[in-house]
Amino acid sequence: PDAITYACSLKACGNIGAIDKGRKIHLEIDRNGLLSKHNLTLGCALINMYSKCGSLADAQIVFTKLRIRDVIAWDALMTGYAQMGKLKDVLYIFKKMNADGHRPSVISFVSLLNACSHACSHVGLVEAGTIAFNAMSTFYFITPTMEHYTCMIDLLGRAGQLDHALMAIEDKFPFHPDNVTWSTMLSACRKWGNVDLGKHAFQHVLQLNDKEDGAYTCMCNIYIDAKGSQCKHVEEAHLYRL
């Protein structure tokens, strides 16, 4: 097998969490000396595989052994830590990447904002995420994508700032909010038990995709969590399917 075949196999292992199979492939790569010949291709594939399987220690070891590290390798490692909500590690990697002369990419900021969201338990992280988001365009000259804006909605939503999140969606988005954005808002409403805003987000999700099963389930749960006063509306949520 060549480097591309190994990289595709590692991606498949990561997607299904088959870390044992991934380790066997890693051993084959080492035995054949392929990592030294295809440093970045296989290095990033290994980092992604280990990260998706939840073994950040192995991902870090692979990264440390890479002879050459470009922004893609840094992003792969940062993404792994972000998925686990390791904000301090993500910030360290982000700063180290800058110090080593690599400018952050679009993916770098997705990881940074996601890490802020997953670790969000106080207003300070909302401020940190907002600073990072604004720095994209003002300092790094990167135009935020829909994914970055949705990350900010997730951050505000997890922090309980639902009104601010809705205001951002309806007044500040430079493009039309998509299904993912409204679903993110709906999930935040479920977390905080906000029935009115939840229904608002739910209706927008249905306008974009009326077969979104997850949205129906989430809205029903919002009503159920609201206990007796809203239980009669559970049937209403189901009626949207008709």
Which residues does each PLM region occupy?
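Terminal (and in a subset, N-terminal) low-complexity or junction segments at the ends
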Residues: 1-242
